[in-house]
Amino acid sequence: MTRNNLTTLAATIVLALLTGGCNTDDRAEGPEMPRFGDPLLAEGRSVWMGTCRACHLLGIAGAPAVTDYGNWAPRIAKGMRALYAGPINGIKGDDGKYKMPPRAGNDRLADAQIERAADYMIAAVEYLEEDARGN
């Protein structure tokens, strides 16, 4: 190995060691998401964790966070059909651009999977709100 190759290798190793702790998952943690015994909610949790969590855990990109109970109350009041329509069809802002892309940004999901994820998220929001109140 030449001196230049050794220098490059050493620099690469040092850089790898210095950046080893840099991980996109080192961001602030949200709440521990509940698990429910209902198999449909368990399926919904799996979809939610893989697709919806990125925005809805902490309220990224304008998405209502699961702990933003006041923001969820009017949405829940509209009923589940309305809650299903948003992630299936997408939600546009006043500027005409999608705030939430169609299919919740995951074209591989069937409508039923998106609906289960919405069911899970609403159950989780209600559970977390009760838990926060100490009930």
Regions found by a protein language model. Name each.
Residues A28-G30, L58-A61, G96-R103:
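A short small-residue
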